[in-house]
From Swiss-Prot:
GO terms for molecular function: dextranase activity. Residues 607-669, 683-788 are annotated as: Disordered. Belongs to the glycosyl hydrolase 66 family. It holds the Pfam family Glyco_hydro_66. It catalyses: Endohydrolysis of (1->6)-alpha-D-glucosidic linkages in dextran. Residues 693-705, 771-788 have a biased composition (Polar residues). InterPro entries: Glyco_hydro_66 (IPR025092), Glyco_hydro_b (IPR013780), Glycoside_hydrolase_SF (IPR017853), Ig-like_fold (IPR013783). It is an enzyme of class 3 (hydrolase). This is Dextranase. Residues 1-38 form the signal peptide. It comes from Streptococcus salivarius.
Length: 822
């Protein structure tokens, strides 16, 4: 029996390690020293880690796969999550719910979330955390009178830091929660030029019902800038936050106090005109140490914000916003991509998208509640969130080069994890099924592992023609913009030395992303098989095209592939102009596929590294993609009038070279198209922006620890054997697995992850067994907890000899219990 570890970047195997075992019936063994050496790793790079267990004939007994990101700057590939009040306790953040929050944060950590913003965790906009106050009730919050325990907030911020992530404090950039008694004189307020947020000439005010909730200052007002900078710096210093997630109520044409009654537009300006100067003023007043971003509601102010020193770009997108595509609103998947493309072109950054799914409408003035849309009916009927609706938005945003912020920790008694369905984050009516969480987990692994292909430096839309046909020759890619449904939306991107083709399945469904009608508007597309993708290679020579045809791969986060990158069958044809066309066979499409085409025909393949002498192998994936599910998937792996659409809606309170010998495939190397393995790392202090650290976010399951190590240090240190400070252990047992008869990946509530720890000399992959309560709460110092992964084998399935290596008769009845989770 052998335990194998493989580290892969795109199609290249970077490094491997394995340990051989001899196991007797009914016995268990602990295996150490599966190592990911720091010299294998490059900063701001995503990797796929696969761990598999094989019998002595090479058959896969069980396996897991996860994305690993090595990064010294989370803003390059932001993966944003939410912490907000609990719907179980009047939207409050309470000490008594800390354990529930911790469990959710551990799960989100395993989903590679590297940044969190704490929503509505403040007392009031102009005094977020009063000094000397342990708990406060939000007086402005008239619908639930939310309570916030500052100890709870501090402990959650600490937990975020221990995971190697950053914590952002949410607050409006120009709001005052006391409309009748604002903190600054009336001269500092913004005044409506048109009837919009109140009457013309009156202070810009947000009202819920008949209750004025917030009044707004002009972000350009220097007195306001100095005041709020001092307030926010004090709050972030005392509570340990790393930055400010600034929010806006939407754009509006305003005047200053002196010109509040003027009808001359020259005396007015848009609130968004001052976003950039406000951000830059905050950077100067608060300091570069703190991160800052502003929610540009519905986008469109990219030109204004181009000179802003904001660290990431965040847009909350609504269907009432104007699309980048002329003459449209932002209602379709393609409109989301268009906005992401615009931000990328203007700023060079990957857009964080806030796009809330379904938004169940329920009128609670009616006894028992009355649904006002299909999603509301679903919620009242107790139905969960429609999984594919969420996954399709995740796929669209990621394939376009952005990140969909959707996962939230709410300490919700009705959900192990939450997916945002409303702009008021504690109000999430639809539960999230375990299988949906499992799929979300797999998508997060994919987005992390292939981040350089999806949104790396230089990745842009390709000008090469691309299309998709079915087995009958019917063209399924009917609309390159992605605004029409009932198609396989296909678009190409290019990067340095490669291209990708993104395939989003909309067969049998419409292109609307919001899905407010819930299950009445089915979002599960018709699965496709045996597709053909044609990609123009115009400009390539015949020789170059032939080389490229041998460097085509397919992968998907969906269950048929679970991030496994497989060699695809590809051939060449010529178009009417005699230019080469790459013809690629795609065996299956569920929701989202990505084709990876290596176009660098001169590069020498990376020579893989093995941690065990004599086990060096070729590093290029060469096996053809198969429509069959891999063996391992059969195992259990335990504005004002001028811009009315830029305002937030009212809301409740991705031919062989004959001179080259065919190389073994990844499937041959790890003998599996595995499902995810968790990555976590041991704990170190978090030093905010000055840290310049590698963040190896763990990628696997419900609980783990993390570490940050300076990127320069991690990249330069040599591989070595495992020291006493970081150890890895795999326990192999011949006891039967409790889930041995399961035929597909399943959610295990008790399992804990495999971890990777990067020390000064190396990184260690550490499969972790399910911990007892006391073990799971054990503190860590320099290293991760010493735990183990259990590989279970029923005694009846092993050979009678207790001195020989176990021979497994039924591979579906063996599981890696310790790293089972999702």
């Amino acid at each position: 029996m052998t335990v194998n570890l493989t580290l892969q970047h795109a199609s290249e195997i970077i490094g491997q390690d394995n340990v051989d075992l001899t196991l007797a019936a009914g016995a268990s063994a602990k295996v150490s020293n599966l190592t990911v050496a720091s010299e294998w790793l490059t900063n701001n790079t995503g990797y796929l880690v696969t761990i598999s267990v094989n019998d002595k004939s090479g058959n896969v007994l069980s396996s897991k796969r996860a994305g690993l990101s090595v990064e010294d700057d989370w803003t390059v590939f932001p993966r944003y999550g939410i912490v907000a009040g609990s719907p179980t306790d009047q939207n409050s953040i309470l000490v008594k719910n800390l354990e529930a929050y911790r469990k959710e944060l551990e799960l989100m950590k395993s989903m590679n979330i590297n940044s969190y913003f704490f929503y509505d965790a403040y007392n009031e906009a102009t005094d977020p955390f009063p000094e000397g106050v342990d708990s406060f009730v939000q007086k402005w919050n008239t619908w639930s009178h939310t309570q916030v325990d500052t100890k709870a907030v501090k402990e959650l911020v600490d937990q975020v830091h221990k995971s190697g992530a950053v914590a952002m404090l949410y607050n409006m950039i120009s709001a005052d929660s006391n409309p009748k008694n604002p903190a600054l004189p009336l001269a500092a307020l913004a005044y409506n030029f048109y009837d919009s947020f109140g009457k013309k000439g009156e202070p810009m005010t947000y009202t819920i019902g008949d209750n004025p909730t917030q009044v707004y200052y002009d972000p350009a007002n220097p007195d306001w800038q100095k005041y709020i900078a001092g307030v926010m710096k004090s709050a972030m210093d005392r509570m340990g936050f790393d930055g400010w997630q600034g929010d806006t109520i939407g754009d509006n044409r305003v005047t200053d106090y002196e010109h509040r009654n003027s009808t001359d537009e020259a005396d007015s300006h848009m609130m968004s005109d001052s976003y950039a100067s406000f951000i830059n003023a905050m950077k100067d007043l608060i300091g570069e140490k703190y991160y800052i971003t502003i929610n540009d509601v519905n986008g469109g102010n990219d030109d204004k914000l181009a000179k802003a020193r904001q660290d990431v770009v965040y847009n909350e997108l609504w269907t009432n916003g104007g699309s980048v595509i002329p003459g449209r609103m932002q209602v379709a998947y393609g409109d989301l991509k268009a906005r992401i493309d615009m931000v990328r072109n203007k700023t060079g950054k990957s857009l964080i998208v806030g796009a809330y799914m379904e938004e169940p409408g329920i009128d609670y003035t009616v006894p028992g509640g009355k649904a006002t849309n299909g999603a509301g009916k679903d919620a009242l009927a107790g139905k969960p969130l429609q999984a594919d609706a969420t996954l399709l938005v995740d796929a669209t945003v990621a394939a376009a080069g952005g990140y969909h912020m959707s996962i939230a920790a709410l300490a919700n008694a009705n959900a192990a994890l939450n997916v945002l369905q409303s702009a008021y984050y504690p109000t999430q009516y639809l539960s999230v099924a375990k299988d949906t969480i499992r799929k979300l987990y797999n998508y997060q692994q994919f987005i992390t592992a292939y981040e350089n292909l999806l949104r790396g430096e230089g990745v842009t839309n390709s000008t090469q023609a691309v299309s998709t046909k079915n087995a009958s020759g019917e063209i399924l890619s009917k609309d390159a913009l992605g605004v029409t449904g009932d198609q396989v939306w296909t678009f190409a991107k290019s990067g340095k030395g490669f291209s990708t083709v993104q395939m989003i399945n909309m067969m049998g469904i419409n292109a609307g992303w919001h899905n407010e009608e819930g299950y009445a508007d089915n979002k599960t597309p018709d699965a496709q098989e045996n597709l053909t993708v044609r990609l123009s290679l115009a400009g390539k020579t015949a020789q170059e095209a032939a080389k490229i045809a041998d460097q085509v791969y397919v992968t998907s986060p969906d269950d048929w592939a679970t991030s496994s990158m497989k060699k695809a069958q590809a051939s060449l044809e010529t178009d009417e102009n005699g230019q080469p066309v790459l013809v690629i066979s795609v065996p299956k499409l569920t929701l989202w596929n990505m084709l990876y085409i290596k176009e660098d025909t001169t590069a020498t393949p990376v020579e893989p590294v093995t941690n065990q002498a004599g086990k060096k192998v070729d590093n290029t994936v060469t096996s053809e993609a198969s429509s069959e599910t891999a063996k391992s998937e059969n195992t259990t792996v335990n504005k004002g009038s001028e811009a009315p659409t830029d305002t937030k809606p009212s809301v409740e309170a991705p031919k062989l070279d004959e001179t080259t010998k065919p190389a073994p495939s990844v499937d041959e190397l790890v003998n599996s198209a595995a499902v995810p393995v968790a990555i976590a790392v041991s704990e170190t202090a978090h030093d905010k922006k000055d840290d310049n650290s590698v963040s190896n976010t763990d990628q696997g399951t419900v609980a783990s620890d993390s570490i940050t190590t300076p990127a320069s240090e991690a990249a330069s240190t040599a591989a070595s054997t495992v020291s006493s400070e970081v150890s890895e252990s795999v326990t192999v047992s011949s006891e039967p697995s409790e889930t041995e008869n399961s035929s597909e990946a399943s959610t295990s509530e008790s399992a804990t992850p495999t971890t990777t720890a990067i020390s000064e000399s190396h990184a260690v992959v550490e499969p972790v067994a399910s911990l007892t309560e006391s073990e799971s709460q054990a503190s860590t110092s320099l290293v991760s907890e010493t735990t183990s992964t259990i590989v279970s084998v029923a005694p009846s399935e092993v050979s009678e000899s207790t001195s020989e290596e176990v021979i497994l008769m039924d591979y579906q009845k063996t599981s890696i219990v310790g790293i089972d989770s999702l």
